[in-house]
Amino acid sequence: MSPAAQLAKAAARSTCMTRLPSGIRVATAPSNSHFAAVGVYVDAGPIYETSIDRGVSHFVSSLAFKSTHGATESQVLKTMAGLGGNLFCTATRESILYQGSVLHHDLPRTVQLLADTTLRPALTEEEIAERRATIAFEAEDLHSRPDAFIGEMMHAVAFGGRGLGNSIFCEPQRARNMTSDTIREYFATYLHPSRMVVAGTGVAHAELVDLVSKAFVPSSTRAPSSVTHSDIETAYVGGSHQLVIPKPPPTHPNYEQTLTHVQVAFPVPPFTHPDMFPVSTLQVLMGGGGAFSAGGPGKGMYSRLYTNVLNRYRWMESCAAFQHAYSSTSLFGISASCVPSFNPHLCNVLAGEFVHMARNLSDEEVARAKNQLKSSLLMNLESQVITVEDIGRQVLAQNQRLEPLELVNNISAVTRDDLVRVAEALVAKPPTMVAVGEDLTKLTDIKETLAAFNASGEALQPVGSAGSFGRVTM
């Protein structure tokens, strides 16, 4: 059977979905695996946080699989160990998800455990106190890693520090002051069956519906919040922000010069918009990565940011396109890092790549990007854990799931003109720029650099080997 025929056969087995009287949705897709993957996806997360409870989602995810009203923490841990321990919880900006992969005969215990930890957590003072210390440490550790922290800065600046601009991490001082009442109020408001999707793969739909109907019974008669993503103000505002990291003492035994980390992004349509496909293709076409490839040569070496940036400028440590997709709006940008002595040149290189995105697109590189995107999508969906997350997230966001064949067909339909259109629309909007480093004094502003590119039609481009500038006509 040809690959196309196999894909068509797999896609014909469409996702099944059922809404129970409690409001909870159950969605499944078949799988021939010996394992079953199941997850609970909650319409919650930092997007709903306010100035009063900011950071509480970090506590909710950190308190997963602790004691419940029916079991102590040690009993819960023993149950997880018996299931293989392959269970986890994480908070994203628009949702909180609990999921895992277990053997088929362990599915009833797993569903019950997921129901107990989401609907019936004990939330003891001892557990919350322990989480305060742990989360404060995690937040302080994050601030010590600029390459990880810069993504949070990007969201805060792009969305004005609210809605999607809320961090998925709790600030250290907020963590120390987080009250148990705030956490319990958040659970009561948002962790309700009517705001949940239970997704599964490798399990019969009727079986999972039966298990969920018995386990996910609301523990309170209180009405949950009816607020949705569309009710939250997530307007893109843009702007720029720089964070200077203090230099350690010159006598520090392990001192290494910190790189300058920069991210530049523009707003793009949400993932529910048809333009998601050309934007995603554009991200793959731009590609990029690090100057050192740990996985060996050949990965994305023909992408724009490899050929135009990493292979040309020896001082560029990393340069990669990124996309953060959400239900109301999204971000598309480039993340880069370099040694501080080349700060004056960095934004000029990035601006040139943004301006050139819509120019000289060859049929070959467009086809290559589309094929890479399709192969990445299908290879990821070979994992049951990723498949169940795909089901849960799609159903939670749009009450339906686009099947793999639909996604592949939509990618195939992307044309060169589509890429030109979205690229030109992208750079016509105001950018967001964030930077982290020890010395940012000579870092230029991306907005001014882009304006100079657009005004003159030509710009100064750094010469990689010498680090000087030469005149390049655009």
From Swiss-Prot:
One of the record's GO molecular function terms: metal ion binding
Locations listed in the record: Mitochondrion inner membrane
GO terms, biological process: protein processing involved in protein targeting to mitochondrion
Disulfide bonds: none
Tagged with keyword Metal-binding: no
Primary site of residence: mitochondrion
InterPro entries: Metalloenz_LuxS/M16 (IPR011249), MPP/UQCRC_Complex (IPR050361), Pept_M16_N (IPR011765), Peptidase_M16_C (IPR007863)
UniProt entry keywords in alphabetical sequence: Membrane, Mitochondrion, Mitochondrion inner membrane, Transit peptide
Gene3D superfamilies: Metalloenzyme, LuxS/M16 peptidase-like
Keyword Membrane: yes
Gene Ontology CC annotation, any one: mitochondrial inner membrane
Protein task: Substrate recognition and binding subunit of the essential mitochondrial processing protease (MPP), which cleaves the mitochondrial sequence off newly imported precursors proteins.
Family under the similarity heading: Belongs to the peptidase M16 family.
PANTHER family: METALLOPROTEASE, MITOCHONDRIAL-PROCESSING PEPTIDASE SUBUNIT ALPHA
Assembly behavior: Heterodimer of mas2 (alpha) and mas1 (beta) subunits, forming the mitochondrial processing protease (MPP) in which mas2 is involved in substrate recognition and binding and mas1 is the catalytic subunit.
Record-given protein name: Mitochondrial-processing peptidase subunit alpha
Organism: Blastocladiella emersonii
